[in-house]
Structures are given as C-alpha cells and as structure tokens.
Amino acid sequence: TGGRLVHMAAADKINRLAQELVGRWGYSRIGPVAAPGAGESLRTLRSKYPQLFFLLDSYDYNNVSAKKCAAAFDKYGHGAAVLAGTKISQAWLAAQTDGYDYAEQAALAVERIQRNLTGSVTIL
C-alpha cells in the first residue's frame, strides 16, 4: 500500500505470521522465497527481519552471485538456504560429457557452488 514495495509488504505479512513459529535456533519455520539478484533488497530484508529464514531462489541466473546471496545470511552465516538445482542437475551439459558421469559432474558443481558461497559468507 502506498509507497511500499511488494516484497517488503509480503515480508511484513510473513513476519506477522512467523512470530509464533520461531524455533530453538531463532528462526521462524516459515519465511520468504527471495531472488538474490538484488543484494541491497536482501540486506534490507535481513536487517528488518532477523528471525525470518530466507530461501534464495535463482542462484542459476547470470546476474546472481555468491556476494549478492551473502546479504541474506546473518553475521554468523545462518538464516538462509540457496537453491541451485538447475546448475547442479545440468552440470554434465556444461562439462560437455556424454551424461554417464552425471553424478560426478553434479558433485563437482555442488563443490564449486559451496566454494563460491563460503568465499562470501562466513559461517560460524
């Protein structure tokens, strides 16, 4: 309403619903799915809603980086999860293999993604 952005209005609603669903680790059992393409929006959401758990979709997109995803995590490296299913399941296509070693290529893709994320997110 008014000058509010849609994702902020949605996060306000989720936050109201989540207040009584906070688990022992300090995060709610419900949270928003967020696109990490706009790192500054994630930074704003994280600072305003420290108890929401964020699910970051679209890590596979070209304009998304581990650095942008880092904005959704708290100072301990907690509070968010990154989805990269397409990047992982189609890793063998990028490697230009015959597809028989798909499990190995998927594992290598996971390792690359993990290295990228841990380079931008400090996990304590």
Residue ranges of predicted features:
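Surface-exposed amphipathic alpha-helices with a cationic face
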Residues: 15-25, 44-49, 114, 118
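C-terminal helical cap(s) of enzyme catalytic domains, especially alpha/beta-barrels
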Residues: 68-79, 90-124
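A C-terminal functional module that forms or caps the active site or interfaces directly
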Residues: 32, 36-83, 87-91
